Protein backbone atom coordinates (compact mmCIF):
# COMPACT_ATOMS: atom_id res chain seq x y z
CA UNK A 1 0.00 0.00 0.00
CA UNK A 2 1.72 3.14 -1.23
CA UNK A 3 -0.75 5.83 -0.23
CA UNK A 4 -0.21 8.10 2.80
CA UNK A 5 -3.79 7.40 3.90
CA UNK A 6 -4.55 4.39 6.10
CA UNK A 7 -7.86 2.78 4.94
CA UNK A 8 -8.67 1.19 8.31
CA UNK A 9 -8.85 4.65 9.91
CA UNK A 10 -12.06 5.37 8.01
CA UNK A 11 -13.83 2.17 9.04
CA UNK A 12 -15.23 1.84 12.56
CA UNK A 13 -15.62 -1.59 14.11
CA UNK A 14 -18.17 -0.25 16.62
CA UNK A 15 -20.49 1.90 14.55
CA UNK A 16 -21.72 2.26 10.97
CA UNK A 17 -22.01 6.02 11.29
CA UNK A 18 -18.91 8.14 11.85
CA UNK A 19 -21.05 10.96 13.29
CA UNK A 20 -20.18 10.25 16.93
CA UNK A 21 -20.75 12.33 20.07
CA UNK A 22 -17.73 13.25 22.17
CA UNK A 23 -18.07 12.96 25.96
CA UNK A 24 -16.22 15.80 27.71
CA UNK A 25 -15.36 15.54 31.42
CA UNK A 26 -15.43 18.94 33.15
CA UNK A 27 -14.70 17.67 36.69
CA UNK A 28 -11.14 18.95 36.74
CA UNK A 29 -9.14 19.74 33.69
CA UNK A 30 -11.47 19.53 30.70
CA UNK A 31 -10.78 16.41 28.66
CA UNK A 32 -12.53 14.01 26.30
CA UNK A 33 -13.11 10.61 27.90
CA UNK A 34 -15.22 8.73 25.34
CA UNK A 35 -17.10 8.72 22.06
CA UNK A 36 -20.66 7.45 21.67
CA UNK A 37 -22.21 6.46 18.34
CA UNK A 38 -25.01 8.65 17.00
CA UNK A 39 -27.81 6.10 17.39
CA UNK A 40 -27.07 5.59 21.11
CA UNK A 41 -26.16 9.14 22.10
CA UNK A 42 -29.62 10.60 22.73
CA UNK A 43 -30.59 7.65 24.94
CA UNK A 44 -27.37 7.62 26.99
CA UNK A 45 -26.15 11.24 26.97
CA UNK A 46 -29.37 13.19 27.43
CA UNK A 47 -29.41 15.97 30.08
CA UNK A 48 -29.50 14.57 33.66
CA UNK A 49 -28.46 11.09 32.50
CA UNK A 50 -25.98 9.01 34.47
CA UNK A 51 -23.23 7.98 32.07
CA UNK A 52 -20.88 5.19 33.16
CA UNK A 53 -17.37 5.04 31.73
CA UNK A 54 -14.58 2.74 32.97
CA UNK A 55 -16.47 2.08 36.20
CA UNK A 56 -16.94 5.78 37.00
CA UNK A 57 -20.31 7.55 37.16
CA UNK A 58 -20.79 10.85 35.36
CA UNK A 59 -23.75 13.23 35.48
CA UNK A 60 -24.61 14.72 32.09
CA UNK A 61 -24.89 18.48 32.59
CA UNK A 62 -25.38 19.56 29.00
CA UNK A 63 -25.83 18.01 25.57
CA UNK A 64 -24.85 20.12 22.57
CA UNK A 65 -26.61 18.33 19.74
CA UNK A 66 -25.31 20.42 16.84
CA UNK A 67 -21.70 20.27 18.07
CA UNK A 68 -22.02 16.54 18.91
CA UNK A 69 -20.69 17.07 22.44
CA UNK A 70 -21.91 16.05 25.90
CA UNK A 71 -20.48 17.72 29.01
CA UNK A 72 -20.34 15.54 32.11
CA UNK A 73 -19.10 15.74 35.70
CA UNK A 74 -18.11 12.93 38.07
CA UNK A 75 -20.75 11.90 40.58
CA UNK A 76 -21.56 9.10 43.00
CA UNK A 77 -25.22 8.07 43.11
CA UNK A 78 -27.10 4.84 43.87
CA UNK A 79 -29.15 4.79 40.66
CA UNK A 80 -28.80 4.65 36.89
CA UNK A 81 -30.98 6.24 34.22
CA UNK A 82 -33.07 4.51 31.59
CA UNK A 83 -34.32 6.50 28.61
CA UNK A 84 -37.98 6.39 27.53
CA UNK A 85 -38.31 6.58 23.77
CA UNK A 86 -41.25 6.65 21.40
CA UNK A 87 -40.77 4.88 18.07
CA UNK A 88 -43.03 5.34 15.06
CA UNK A 89 -42.74 3.00 12.08
CA UNK A 90 -44.10 3.43 8.58
CA UNK A 91 -43.96 0.59 6.06
CA UNK A 92 -42.37 1.78 2.81
CA UNK A 93 -42.09 -1.44 0.82
CA UNK A 94 -42.92 -5.12 1.33
CA UNK A 95 -40.20 -7.41 -0.07
CA UNK A 96 -41.73 -10.73 1.01
CA UNK A 97 -44.89 -11.88 2.72
CA UNK A 98 -46.23 -15.29 3.66
CA UNK A 99 -49.13 -16.68 5.67
CA UNK A 100 -48.46 -19.09 8.48
CA UNK A 101 -51.19 -21.12 10.21
CA UNK A 102 -53.21 -18.20 11.57
CA UNK A 103 -51.04 -15.12 11.05
CA UNK A 104 -48.88 -13.39 8.46
CA UNK A 105 -45.19 -12.51 8.51
CA UNK A 106 -43.53 -9.94 6.28
CA UNK A 107 -40.13 -8.49 5.49
CA UNK A 108 -39.55 -5.10 3.94
CA UNK A 109 -38.27 -1.55 4.15
CA UNK A 110 -39.54 0.78 6.86
CA UNK A 111 -39.10 4.37 7.98
CA UNK A 112 -38.32 4.62 11.69
CA UNK A 113 -38.73 7.77 13.80
CA UNK A 114 -37.41 7.55 17.35
CA UNK A 115 -37.59 10.31 19.93
CA UNK A 116 -36.32 10.20 23.51
CA UNK A 117 -39.16 11.80 25.49
CA UNK A 118 -38.14 11.11 29.09
CA UNK A 119 -36.09 9.04 31.48
CA UNK A 120 -36.44 6.95 34.63
CA UNK A 121 -34.09 6.72 37.60
CA UNK A 122 -33.63 3.07 38.54
CA UNK A 123 -32.05 2.17 41.88
CA UNK A 124 -29.20 -0.34 41.85
CA UNK A 125 -29.91 -3.84 43.22
CA UNK A 126 -33.61 -3.27 44.01
CA UNK A 127 -34.45 -1.91 40.51
CA UNK A 128 -36.94 0.53 42.09
CA UNK A 129 -38.10 3.50 40.06
CA UNK A 130 -36.97 6.43 42.24
CA UNK A 131 -37.71 9.29 39.88
CA UNK A 132 -38.31 10.42 36.34
CA UNK A 133 -38.08 13.40 34.06
CA UNK A 134 -39.34 14.69 30.71
CA UNK A 135 -37.05 15.50 27.80
CA UNK A 136 -37.42 17.39 24.55
CA UNK A 137 -34.82 16.11 22.10
CA UNK A 138 -34.66 15.95 18.29
CA UNK A 139 -36.09 12.96 16.46
CA UNK A 140 -33.75 10.38 14.99
CA UNK A 141 -34.99 9.17 11.60
CA UNK A 142 -33.73 6.37 9.38
CA UNK A 143 -34.73 3.93 6.66
CA UNK A 144 -33.97 0.34 7.52
CA UNK A 145 -35.23 -3.20 6.97
CA UNK A 146 -37.65 -4.98 9.26
CA UNK A 147 -39.47 -8.23 9.95
CA UNK A 148 -43.02 -7.93 11.21
CA UNK A 149 -45.67 -10.25 12.53
CA UNK A 150 -49.33 -9.41 11.83
CA UNK A 151 -51.85 -10.73 14.35
CA UNK A 152 -55.32 -10.98 12.72
CA UNK A 153 -57.84 -8.64 14.34
CA UNK A 154 -60.38 -11.44 14.82
CA UNK A 155 -57.86 -13.47 16.86
CA UNK A 156 -56.78 -10.47 18.95
CA UNK A 157 -60.31 -9.28 19.76
CA UNK A 158 -61.65 -12.79 20.43
CA UNK A 159 -59.27 -13.33 23.35
CA UNK A 160 -61.25 -13.77 26.61
CA UNK A 161 -59.55 -10.91 28.44
CA UNK A 162 -60.15 -7.23 29.11
CA UNK A 163 -58.85 -4.66 26.61
CA UNK A 164 -56.13 -3.60 29.04
CA UNK A 165 -54.97 -7.19 29.54
CA UNK A 166 -54.89 -7.81 25.78
CA UNK A 167 -52.67 -4.76 25.25
CA UNK A 168 -50.45 -5.92 28.12
CA UNK A 169 -50.17 -9.33 26.47
CA UNK A 170 -49.27 -7.69 23.18
CA UNK A 171 -46.39 -5.86 24.85
CA UNK A 172 -45.39 -9.16 26.46
CA UNK A 173 -45.18 -10.88 23.05
CA UNK A 174 -43.12 -7.97 21.70
CA UNK A 175 -40.77 -8.21 24.70
CA UNK A 176 -40.10 -11.94 24.31
CA UNK A 177 -39.72 -11.61 20.52
CA UNK A 178 -37.15 -8.87 21.03
CA UNK A 179 -35.14 -11.08 23.40
CA UNK A 180 -35.46 -14.40 21.55
CA UNK A 181 -34.88 -13.12 18.00
CA UNK A 182 -31.19 -12.19 18.56
CA UNK A 183 -30.47 -15.83 19.47
CA UNK A 184 -31.43 -16.84 15.94
CA UNK A 185 -29.77 -13.85 14.27
CA UNK A 186 -26.53 -14.30 16.26
CA UNK A 187 -26.45 -10.63 17.23
CA UNK A 188 -26.72 -8.42 20.30
CA UNK A 189 -30.17 -7.39 21.49
CA UNK A 190 -29.24 -3.74 20.90
CA UNK A 191 -28.63 -4.46 17.20
CA UNK A 192 -32.38 -4.70 16.66
CA UNK A 193 -35.32 -2.62 17.81
CA UNK A 194 -38.94 -3.52 18.51
CA UNK A 195 -42.15 -1.58 17.99
CA UNK A 196 -45.89 -2.25 17.82
CA UNK A 197 -48.16 -0.76 15.18
CA UNK A 198 -51.67 -1.00 13.76
CA UNK A 199 -51.83 -2.73 10.38
CA UNK A 200 -55.20 -1.14 9.54
CA UNK A 201 -54.18 2.50 10.08
CA UNK A 202 -50.37 2.46 10.06
CA UNK A 203 -50.28 4.17 13.47
CA UNK A 204 -47.74 3.20 16.14
CA UNK A 205 -48.54 2.07 19.68
CA UNK A 206 -46.75 4.27 22.26
CA UNK A 207 -44.96 2.67 25.21
CA UNK A 208 -46.88 2.54 28.47
CA UNK A 209 -44.53 4.86 30.38
CA UNK A 210 -44.47 7.69 27.84
CA UNK A 211 -45.31 11.15 29.32
CA UNK A 212 -48.97 11.97 28.65
CA UNK A 213 -48.20 15.41 27.23
CA UNK A 214 -46.16 13.82 24.43
CA UNK A 215 -49.10 11.81 23.11
CA UNK A 216 -51.21 13.08 20.24
CA UNK A 217 -54.66 11.48 20.28
CA UNK A 218 -54.81 11.71 16.48
CA UNK A 219 -51.70 9.54 16.22
CA UNK A 220 -52.78 6.87 18.70
CA UNK A 221 -54.42 3.74 17.29
CA UNK A 222 -57.87 2.84 18.60
CA UNK A 223 -57.15 -0.33 20.58
CA UNK A 224 -60.85 -1.04 21.13
CA UNK A 225 -61.81 -0.71 17.46
CA UNK A 226 -62.56 -4.11 15.89
CA UNK A 227 -60.39 -3.05 12.94
CA UNK A 228 -57.28 -2.75 15.16
CA UNK A 229 -54.83 -5.34 13.80
CA UNK A 230 -51.47 -5.45 15.62
CA UNK A 231 -48.13 -5.52 13.84
CA UNK A 232 -45.01 -6.35 15.88
CA UNK A 233 -41.86 -5.07 14.17
CA UNK A 234 -38.32 -6.33 14.73
CA UNK A 235 -36.09 -3.96 12.76
CA UNK A 236 -32.36 -3.53 12.14
CA UNK A 237 -31.06 -0.73 14.35
CA UNK A 238 -28.80 0.58 11.58
CA UNK A 239 -29.54 2.85 8.59
CA UNK A 240 -30.20 0.79 5.49
CA UNK A 241 -30.27 -2.44 7.49
CA UNK A 242 -27.46 -4.97 7.85
CA UNK A 243 -29.26 -8.16 6.87
CA UNK A 244 -30.57 -9.27 10.26
CA UNK A 245 -34.33 -9.17 9.70
CA UNK A 246 -34.44 -11.40 6.57
CA UNK A 247 -33.20 -14.33 8.65
CA UNK A 248 -36.29 -14.05 10.89
CA UNK A 249 -38.59 -14.20 7.88
CA UNK A 250 -36.99 -17.51 6.83
CA UNK A 251 -37.64 -19.07 10.27
CA UNK A 252 -41.42 -19.16 9.77
CA UNK A 253 -43.02 -20.85 12.84
CA UNK A 254 -39.75 -21.66 14.63
CA UNK A 255 -39.38 -18.17 16.10
CA UNK A 256 -42.92 -18.12 17.53
CA UNK A 257 -42.57 -21.67 18.87
CA UNK A 258 -39.38 -20.72 20.72
CA UNK A 259 -41.06 -17.62 22.18
CA UNK A 260 -43.92 -19.76 23.51
CA UNK A 261 -41.48 -22.31 24.98
CA UNK A 262 -39.56 -19.49 26.69
CA UNK A 263 -42.68 -18.14 28.40
CA UNK A 264 -44.01 -21.56 29.41
CA UNK A 265 -40.64 -22.66 30.83
CA UNK A 266 -40.37 -19.59 33.07
CA UNK A 267 -41.45 -20.41 36.67
CA UNK A 268 -42.73 -16.89 37.45
CA UNK A 269 -46.44 -16.26 37.96
CA UNK A 270 -47.15 -12.88 36.40
CA UNK A 271 -44.09 -12.04 34.31
CA UNK A 272 -40.42 -11.26 34.80
CA UNK A 273 -37.39 -10.08 32.78
CA UNK A 274 -36.82 -13.68 31.63
CA UNK A 275 -40.14 -13.98 29.79
CA UNK A 276 -42.60 -11.12 29.10
CA UNK A 277 -40.83 -8.39 31.06
CA UNK A 278 -41.05 -7.08 34.64
CA UNK A 279 -44.59 -7.03 36.04
CA UNK A 280 -44.52 -3.26 36.63
CA UNK A 281 -43.77 -2.70 32.95
CA UNK A 282 -45.67 -5.51 31.25
CA UNK A 283 -48.83 -4.98 33.30
CA UNK A 284 -51.53 -7.22 34.75
CA UNK A 285 -52.13 -10.53 32.99
CA UNK A 286 -49.34 -10.02 30.44
CA UNK A 287 -47.87 -13.51 30.77
CA UNK A 288 -51.13 -15.43 30.44
CA UNK A 289 -52.38 -13.29 27.55
CA UNK A 290 -49.03 -13.49 25.72
CA UNK A 291 -49.17 -17.29 25.90
CA UNK A 292 -52.73 -17.31 24.58
CA UNK A 293 -51.80 -15.02 21.68
CA UNK A 294 -48.89 -17.26 20.65
CA UNK A 295 -50.95 -20.45 21.03
CA UNK A 296 -53.67 -18.99 18.81
CA UNK A 297 -51.12 -18.05 16.15
CA UNK A 298 -49.60 -21.52 16.06
Predicted regions and their residues:
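Extended, highly charged accessory segments
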Residues: 1-45, 49-55, 62-298
Amino acid sequence: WTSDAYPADSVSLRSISSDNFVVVDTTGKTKAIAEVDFSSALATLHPKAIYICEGEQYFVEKLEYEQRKAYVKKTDVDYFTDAIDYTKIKILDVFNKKNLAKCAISHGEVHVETQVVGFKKIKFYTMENVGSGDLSLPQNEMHTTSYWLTIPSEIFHSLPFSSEEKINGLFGVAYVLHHVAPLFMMCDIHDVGVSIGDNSTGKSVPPRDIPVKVLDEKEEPAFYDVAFEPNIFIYDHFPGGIGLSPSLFDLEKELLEQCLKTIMACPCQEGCPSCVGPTRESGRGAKQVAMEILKNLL
